[in-house]
Design a protein with these regions (language model features):
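Conserved structural motif at the start of ABC-family nucleotide-binding domains
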Residues: 11, 26-28, 81
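Helical segment within the ABC ATPase nucleotide-binding domain
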Residues: 172-185
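The feature captures the beta-strand-to-loop junction immediately N-terminal to the Walker
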Residues: 39-44
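Catalytic Walker B motif of ABC-type/P-loop ATPase nucleotide-binding domains
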Residues: 157-161, 166
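Conserved ABC transporter NBD signature motif
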Residues: 58, 62-75, 79-80
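ABC-family P-loop ATPase nucleotide-binding domains
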Residues: 88-145
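Short coil-to-beta microelement around the adenine-binding A-loop and adjacent beta1/P-loop entry
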Residues: 23-24, 78
Length: 195
């Protein structure tokens, strides 16, 4: 059974440990995150935030116990990613792609993508279907990423430095949109930031 029940944690880590050569990034780390929470991992460079995210997403090997939405990200990553969305701090869209093509692509690869919902989000921005990424400001690119992600019915949204490089007004708009249009008691948001 893969459904996350309201009394079960979305993420549960016990003794999470990861070393890179001689550098210990995570040292016997324990944490638990329940459904319907917004959690921020805040700290300086080298604190282990990105390493923890990579473990949660099943992108790196690690020691210890880690369960995400009732699954082991090391062995059940493909299944897990049906219920997880991720925006990386270095998330890049091809500069040649148009808004409509980005929507088409995500619709083709993610079974829980709602095209109509994405188009509604985009209608509230300055983005136009024929606009190419190379014609967009950084803030507009973030709006496109956000529209694509918010249109996926995911239980866990993982954001790594999602507002990096944005001015204070765009940051505020980003988080307001996320809270008002996406977040609810069934969804969990995990954010890392230095800010």
């Amino acid at each position: 059974m893969n459904a996350v029940l309201s009394n079960h944690p979305v993420i549960s880590a016990r003794g999470l440990r990861k070393a890179y050569k001689n550098k210990l990034a995570l040292d016997n780390t324990d944490f638990e995150i329940g459904p319907g929470k917004i959690i921020g991992l805040i700290g300086p460079n080298g604190a282990g935030k990105t390493t923890a995210l990579k473990a949660v997403l099943g992108l790196i090997p690690f020691e210890g116990e880690l369960e995400v939405l009732g699954r082991d990200p090391r062995t059940q990553r493909d299944d897990l990613m049906n219920d997880v969305c991720f925006i990386a701090d270095v998330a890049v869209l091809p500069r040649w792609i148009r808004v409509s093509e980005a929507i088409e692509f995500v619709a083709g690869v993610h079974p829980r993508f709602d095209r109509a919902k994405c188009e509604r989000f985009i209608a509230n921005t300055q983005l136009k279907p024929k606009m190419r990424v190379r014609e967009m400001s950084k803030g507009m690119i973030v709006q496109l990423h956000l529209a694509l992600v918010m249109a996926i019915d995911a239980k866990l949204l993982v954001l790594a430095e999602p507002t990096l490089g944005l001015d204070i007004l765009m940051r505020k708009q980003f988080y307001e949109t996320l809270l008002n249009e996406y977040f609810d008691e069934q969804r969990t948001i995990l954010v890392t930031t230095h800010q």
